[in-house]
A protein has these predicted regions:
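Local cysteine-cluster metal-coordination motifs and their immediate loop/turn environment
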Residues: 2-5, 43-58, 277-289, 433
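Mid-chain, well-packed structural core segment of small domains
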Residues: 412-441
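Conserved AdoMet/S-adenosylmethionine-binding subsite of the radical SAM
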Residues: 103-237, 242
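Short hydrophobic/aromatic-enriched beta-strand-loop microsegments
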Residues: 147-152, 439-450
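Non-catalytic interface/targeting segments
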Residues: 328-407, 411-414, 418, 443-486
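N-terminal [4Fe-4S]-dependent radical SAM core
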Residues: 1-41, 55-69, 83, 87-90, ...
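Short Fe-S-cluster ligation motifs
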Residues: 76-97, 312-323
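C-terminal accessory regions of radical SAM enzymes
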Residues: 257-338
Length: 486
């Protein structure tokens, strides 16, 4: 089986790039259904202040960047990685993403990478940074074969006007710098560092926080500049701005970005750049598949008493390789089952009309989650010619876990107000009727079937498109092999 990408939007990439991202869940939309990541919180300090950020070091009830339940030393982090790698054999990536900035804590960051590289050579290593110190450490990163770096860049305004509204200050060359000057220095360092990374063959993912009224209309210019310097991927992240999080923007009344605002920004920026659309804005101690939070299972007391020798046996690279070979076999047959969708044309619709389809999935690229337990919906745009993934939409509470036993359908209807169709593994009569009353079709006949083919099939089925095909028209051998894995 080839290691080439099973995602149509990635198949045009050079083979060496496809190989780099093939099992990286953040850089490959296809991989995120199958491979897990771990973030270790070894970097508490930060060298800039962002108005959308409030770091918390002992927080278990918030799901956003900058928070962690516990900080780790490099040795503790390496032990955690090895323990988790033995438990979660689909783990493919170690990232350092805070709770501060990885490169504002260089000794801890690179000591962690050294310890892990010596003992878990099969993992990809990556880090996340604001970019202020990036030029200084590019050569150091290459020593550890760190070939994926994420840089948060929210403006390319050379006057510093936009940046001064986002960053009150930076700490650079042993002094605190404020206002427009701070923003201009930060931008210069970000661009310089990203260019150096590109020259070294390091893939750059750029994160941009979508801040309504401040940089929302400017992100198109950010995307153009990123493409110009060779950045691989652009991720538009809606600002999380609830007052209870204690950020300057949240307390100052700057609202969280809406799903619609994110979609509009992605549409505008996607003309220039390849976009990441499956981001979940992970915590600094995230563990598991993207969209899955298993961090609370792996606190220090679980692994800290174990020696490195014990942990190497527990990690068991051979068993991990065997497990990941099975994942690749599953992906191969999933790709075959979705083959007809992979041949989609550039246009999604022959009439320019498309709909939004919501899907419930617990991973693996399959429709396999009950409506009542869903914590997020995957949103696809679909027409008669093809489909494309848009983004995910989180729910604050599951339908079957509402307060006082209530089933909160109203928040779900609000989340899906622009959708026409929901595909789910199972749904009860009451929510199905509620959805129908709001004009939403729900269908559970595609349970345990591939998402992509199901979305296209259901769109054609329900919206009077002539060329309808059902799941039994899929290649029977591939579907049979695929279902053996479930």
């Amino acid at each position: 089986m080839s290691c080439s990408s099973s995602n149509p939007s990635e198949s045009f990439l050079p083979q060496d790039i496809q190989d780099k991202i093939h099992n990286h869940p953040c850089y490959s939309e296809g991989a995120h259904h199958h491979y897990a990541r771990i973030h270790v919180a070894v970097a508490p300090a930060c060298n800039i202040q962002c108005n959308y950020c409030n770091r918390k070091y002992d927080c278990s009830n918030e799901s956003r960047p900058g928070v962690t339940s516990e900080r780790l030393s490099p040795e503790e982090a390496a032990k955690k990685v090895m323990f988790v790698g033995g438990e979660v054999k689909r783990l493919s990536v170690l990232g350092i993403a805070g709770p501060g900035d990885a490169l504002a804590n260089p000794k801890k960051t690179f000591e962690t990478f050294r310890l892990v590289r010596e003992r878990a050579s099969d993992l990809k290593l990556c880090l996340s940074t604001n970019g202020l110190e990036l030029p200084k450490f590019v050569d150091e990163m290459t020593k550890y074969n760190i070939d994926h770096v994420t840089v948060t860049i929210n403006t390319v305004d050379e006057t510093g006007e936009i940046g001064s509204k986002i960053y009150p200050w930076i700490f650079y060359n042993n002094k605190r710098i404020y206002g427009k000057e701070a923003s201009k220095i930060l931008l210069q360092r970000q661009l310089e560092g990203m260019k150096m990374c590109v020259e070294k063959g390091i893939l750059i993912k750029a994160n941009s926080v979508l801040i309504p009224g401040i940089n929302d209309k400017h992100l198109v210019e950010v995307s153009k500049k990123l493409k110009e310097i060779g950045v691989f991927l652009h991720n538009i992240m809606p600002i999380i701005s609830e007052p209870e999080h204690g950020t300057a923007f949240g307390l100052g009344g700057v609202p969280s970005a809406t799903d619609q605002q994110q979609m509009e920004a992605q549409e505008a920026c996607g003309m220039d750049m390849k976009l990441m659309q499956h981001c979940r804005q992970c915590r600094a101690d995230a563990v598991g598949l993207i969209g899955e939070d298993r961090g609370q299972e792996f606190s220090k007391n679980v692994f800290n008493s174990m020696s490195f020798d014990e942990l190497e046996n527990h990690y068991n690279i051979k068993a991990r390789q065997e497990s990941q070979a099975k994942i690749e076999e599953f992906r191969f047959f999933l790709d075959k089952a979705n083959e007809r969708v992979k041949k989609e044309k550039a246009e999604l619709s022959s009439t320019s009309e498309t709909i939004l389809v919501a899907v419930t999935s617990a991973g693996q690229g399959m429709i396999k989650q009950h409506f009542g337990t869903v914590k997020e919906f995957l949103i696809y745009e679909a027409g008669d010619l093809g489909i494309r993934f848009i983004h995910h939409r989180k729910l604050d509470v599951e339908y079957c876990a509402g307060p006082d036993g209530a089933n909160p359908i109203e928040p779900i209807l609000a989340k899906l107000k622009d959708c026409k169709l929901i595909l789910t593994a199972k749904i009860g009569e009451c929510p199905q009727n509620d959805l129908a009353g709001a004009g939403l079709i729900s269908d559970q006949s595609y349970a345990n079937m591939p998402i992509e083919t199901s979305v296209l099939s259901a769109t054609r089925k329900y919206f009077n498109i002539s060329e309808v095909y059902e799941m039994n028209s899929l290649p029977s051998a591939e579907m049979s092999r695929l279902l053996q894995f479930l």
